């Protein structure tokens, strides 16, 4: 039987995994220049992902027009997921 701590950890891990998918979607859609980021659902996607990604802008300079902030952001989230997964109690 799982206790409350495991439930909180599993919910947090699931949220972080969904957030990684949102970042990947935002990153993939960035290659399409005709997308209007002020129309729905693109506006909501950018409002959810851009504040986090902006934390990492400028950490590494762009190379050949490629922004590395999503890679840094996803790596950090993945590291946090790994730390939280280790705290889960085995069944």
UniProtKB/Swiss-Prot annotation:
InterPro entries: CCB3/YggT
GO BP term, example: chloroplast fission
An example Gene Ontology CC term for this record: membrane
Statement: the UniProt record of this protein carries the keyword Plastid: yes
Coiled-coil residues: none
Keyword Plastid (UniProt): yes
Sorted UniProt keywords: Chloroplast, Plastid
Compartments where located: Plastid, Chloroplast
Origin superkingdom: Eukaryota
Family: Belongs to the ycf19 family.
Protein name as it appears in the record: Uncharacterized protein ycf19
Gene (name only): ycf19
């Amino acid at each position: 039987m799982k206790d409350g701590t495991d439930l909180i950890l599993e919910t947090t891990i699931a949220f972080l995994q969904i957030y990684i998918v949102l970042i990947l979607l935002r990153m993939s859609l960035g290659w399409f220049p005709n997308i209007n980021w002020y129309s729905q659902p693109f506006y909501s996607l950018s409002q959810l992902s851009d504040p986090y990604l902006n934390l990492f802008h400028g950490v590494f300079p762009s190379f050949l027009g490629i922004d590395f902030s999503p890679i840094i952001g996803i790596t950090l989230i993945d590291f946090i997921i790994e730390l939280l997964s280790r705290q889960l109690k085995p069944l």
